[in-house]
């Protein structure tokens, strides 16, 4: 009996995708390719899926990352065989470190065509190595392989992802032919072997993990410090509520979307007199991870290390992820639960040392006022990246905020003060690639206006993903801070003789024609007032994407930082 392989390929694809949908996959991202036809056609025919496409697999991976980041759901990707698969690695590596759930469906040649010189065939087994939580290498579809085996195999991978997060990889070896008009009912008997599952709405297998919640020790006699890292806004707000309840100072990373009276800590922690006001802290409670400030991480290591030398400072960490997040290898108590759930269990807590760091908060107000006086007091003055960082809270009101990597995210960490803003970043591997694509994915999932900040080198790296904004009707402002290369290296002790040629790599490019190529609006303001006006006006009455290029001298931000540091030491 001859087998219609194309139909069998589609039956397996339909089975996999239906089960993924029951695991919560609603968005599917597809790149063009022939070998992936069975998956592509079945995804397109499934009314439960929202389909997203991109011609570049690297950008596709980051778009899926943004969708998963914003929706808090697993997102599937479908790509063809060969280097298309390899191009997904950067996004998968980021997801490994930040926990977004990607389900990577890669089409492959059958085993007999791998390693023998066949076209577009590479070894895809284990290609993502330790960057995925689990992987499944499927054989070529045959009638002798039961569909219930296929389902339990997919379920096992998805159960692992449910527990550990990050990406999982399902490699699908499809033999030719790949195209057929024959109906799948030709193999109705094969389909009926899982008829009960097909008629239901639940996953083939189900697994229930017991939840354990360790008691939270009383901390009312501690002088505590609350640190809020990268978290969804609702979780960050819960963490700040705990700090307010205890009367303790709060150091909020800009990725949290909240702030406090102890803002700008990456600036004032370098001032010995100000930093010393935290010396009495004997308990640090950190919610969420990925703190941007290197100065805070150094302070944390130094302060908590006293515990190993006869001191008594404790370090608590609250994050639902099971992975180790302890770069200084400190003695740490980790509650693997959502901050909101942890805070709810402390509703009766109070502290006898409430307000112990209020004097420091009063000093920090002077830092805020001084920064505003230096950099944004005259809206008609020349634009600077620090001015943009100070102004970000005003421009981001009522919209989502996506912040790229390198210099600008650090300036927001130093000078920004966000007020209940939903913030998105790629601060796992902290690469400069895929940022436009990730931002597009976030906006597609949330359907909100978006303000994005990205550096010029990052923009060049992901330029073709501007195509993802071409047909968007939602207003978005893509601010490109163009300092002509990697100005961040001015902050690092790189060899002076090689600084420009091998680190900064100035390019001399502007972005007006790039915006036009992808049908996007473009403006290049010359003053802070003009910048503020055009951003606010676009969110008020515009639609689609507006590229705003802010051009500054390459050494401006670093010179401003050096000057401000001197002023800070003079103030205190």
Swiss-Prot record:
Keyword Metal-binding part of the UniProt annotation: yes
Pfam families in alphabetical order: TPP_enzyme_C, TPP_enzyme_M_2, TPP_enzyme_N
Enzyme class: transferase
GO MF annotation: an example: magnesium ion binding
An individual GO BP term: menaquinone biosynthetic process
This protein's UniProt keywords: Magnesium, Manganese, Menaquinone biosynthesis, Metal-binding, Thiamine pyrophosphate, Transferase
InterPro entries linked to this entry: MenaQ_synth_MenD (IPR004433), MenD_middle (IPR032264), THDP-binding (IPR029061), Thiamin_PyroP_enz_TPP-bd_dom (IPR012001), TPP_enzyme_TPP-bd (IPR011766)
CDD domains in alphabetical order: TPP_PYR_MenD, TPP_SHCHC_synthase
The organism's place on the tree of life at top rank: Bacteria
Catalytic activities: isochorismate + 2-oxoglutarate + H(+) = 5-enolpyruvoyl-6-hydroxy-2-succinyl-cyclohex-3-ene-1-carboxylate + CO2
This enzyme's EC code(s): 2.2.1.9
Cofactor: Mg(2+); Mn(2+); thiamine diphosphate
Cofactor info, note text: Binds 1 thiamine pyrophosphate per subunit.
Pathway: Quinol/quinone metabolism; 1,4-dihydroxy-2-naphthoate biosynthesis; 1,4-dihydroxy-2-naphthoate from chorismate: step 2/7; Quinol/quinone metabolism; menaquinone biosynthesis
Self-association and partners: Homodimer.
The family this protein is said to belong to: Belongs to the TPP enzyme family. MenD subfamily.
HAMAP family named among the record's database cross-references: MenD
Annotated function: Catalyzes the thiamine diphosphate-dependent decarboxylation of 2-oxoglutarate and the subsequent addition of the resulting succinic semialdehyde-thiamine pyrophosphate anion to isochorismate to yield 2-succinyl-5-enolpyruvyl-6-hydroxy-3-cyclohexene-1-carboxylate (SEPHCHC).
Full protein name: 2-succinyl-5-enolpyruvyl-6-hydroxy-3-cyclohexene-1-carboxylate synthase
Species whose genome carries this gene: Vibrio campbellii (strain ATCC BAA-1116)
